Swiss-Prot record:
The keyword Signal applies. The keyword Signal applies. Pfam families: Prokineticin. Residues 1-21 form the signal peptide. GO terms for molecular function: toxin activity. It is found in: Secreted. One of its GO terms (cellular component) is extracellular region. Expressed by the venom gland. This is U8-theraphotoxin-Hhn1b. Belongs to the AVIT (prokineticin) family. Keywords: Disulfide bond, Secreted, Signal, Toxin. Disulfide bonds join 23-35, 29-44, 34-67, 54-75. It comes from the Eukaryota.
Length: 84
């Protein structure tokens, strides 16, 4: 029984790793996504759509609160995507 529980726990942890799409840099993420999060826990997240949380674009491609906005949008002063 303990072996089954351990195997299940390892499987769940492996699935969480796949779903979270952890990243170290922008190169680790697919198109339409950016690498964002704290120094210790970065994940590939989609670019912000209308009304969603965003962060301003920067030349270093380092984002903590959210990805930049999609094309034809801008990031407001309250870090929400809106029409340009």
């Amino acid at each position: 029984m303990k072996v089954v529980l351990i195997v299940c726990l390892v499987w769940v942890m492996a699935m969480m790793e796949l779903v979270s799409c952890e990243c170290w840099s922008q190169a680790d993420c697919s198109d339409g996504h950016c690498c964002a999060g704290s120094s210790f826990s970065k994940n590939c997240r989609p670019y912000g759509g209308d009304g969603e949380q965003c962060g301003p674009r920067n030349k270093y491609e380092v984002y903590s609160t959210g990805c930049p906005y999609e094309e034809n949008l801008m990031c407001s002063v309250i870090n929400r995507c809106q029409s340009a």
